[in-house]
Amino acid sequence: MVPSLALVPGEPAGIGPELCVRLAQRPRPDAHLIAYADPDTLHSAAKSLSLSVRLLDPDQPARAPGDLPLHPVRQAVATRFGAPDPANAAAVIAGLRGAADACLTGRLQGIVTGPVHKAVINAGGIPYTGTTELLADHAGCPVVMMLANSIVRVALVTTHLPLRAVADAITADALQQCLRITHAAMQRDFGLEDPRIAVLGLNPHAGEDGLLGREELDIVIPVIEQLRGDGMHLIGPLPADTAFLPQKLGGFDAVVAMYHDQGLPVLKYSGFEQAVNITLGLPYPRVAVDHGTALELAGRRIADPSSLMAATALCARLAARR
């Protein structure tokens, strides 16, 4: 059975709507996509691209280029590409929550999300740190953020934290939870019976035997040894500056990084256009683009849909496995 997936464009003034319109030009045999978006914004995006879009009822199949089933989410004000309005923050969140509700009730089997502008959501009076955190809270379960491309998969112990707060957030419980969720997802979603997971140290040179920090000795190594006893194939703690060398990456199925900018620069450098953001641990697959709203590109017909296409293809595969 072909899975039904929500397609949520994110910030309406960014490139998300036009990427969705571009995606609709190629009907997919692997998924039934339903956009959770404002219809006027999608029509405006199509006009800016000189493309056609035909918005269908959610249950209607997309058969021709430009067909896009729609669950309408009305905005408070009309979209001006490149100029986000906090008045539309509630509609952005409503689209995400509506899609999540449909997955939790079994009406849909996954969510593909476009980029959201955190500052605009907060300016609209809605506390928001990220879609990963919002969906985790909505589902009531712990999750892990993983970024992936064709070369490497990187899971994060901490996500959107100031650097000065990272060390305090690296606890035995947090690391163990991240590793357990990552291990389970690699087995269930990626079909790896015995996934090989590399664990990075927090400090330079993985602490250098305590000389450059004790987190490896006091937290990371004890957790790794405990989970190895449970049967997990864990490698580390590894110094982050050499863990991503090509000759080493072939020995890992995933890398667990301690913080956002430890693991993601290498991934984005190695294949930014095809990179995607996967939320591990949810009761349904959620895959997002790995780029921002790109307000400066919105409406200019130059935004690259590669990440959204990759996210949609992966979400369809993950949904089919469940």
From Swiss-Prot:
Its cofactor is Zn(2+); Mg(2+); Co(2+). It comes from the Bacteria. GO terms for biological process: pyridoxal phosphate biosynthetic process; pyridoxine biosynthetic process. Substrate binds at T132, K268, N277, R286. Keywords: Cobalt, Cytoplasm, Magnesium, Metal-binding, NAD, NADP, Oxidoreductase, Pyridoxine biosynthesis, Zinc. A divalent metal cation binds at H160, H205, H260. It catalyses: 4-(phosphooxy)-L-threonine + NAD(+) = 3-amino-2-oxopropyl phosphate + CO2 + NADH. One of its GO terms (cellular component) is cytoplasm. Binds 1 divalent metal cation per subunit. Can use ions such as Zn(2+), Mg(2+) or Co(2+). One of its GO terms (molecular function) is magnesium ion binding. InterPro entries: PdxA, PdxA_fam. Its EC number is 1.1.1.262. Pathway: Cofactor biosynthesis; pyridoxine 5'-phosphate biosynthesis; pyridoxine 5'-phosphate from D-erythrose 4-phosphate: step 4/5. It is found in: Cytoplasm. Catalyzes the NAD(P)-dependent oxidation of 4-(phosphooxy)-L-threonine (HTP) into 2-amino-3-oxo-4-(phosphooxy)butyric acid which spontaneously decarboxylates to form 3-amino-2-oxopropyl phosphate (AHAP). NCBIfam families: pdxA (TIGR00557). The active site is located at the dimer interface. Belongs to the PdxA family. Homodimer. This is 4-hydroxythreonine-4-phosphate dehydrogenase. It comes from Xanthomonas oryzae pv. oryzae (strain PXO99A). The lineage of its organism: Bacteria, Pseudomonadati, Pseudomonadota, Gammaproteobacteria, Lysobacterales. The gene is pdxA.
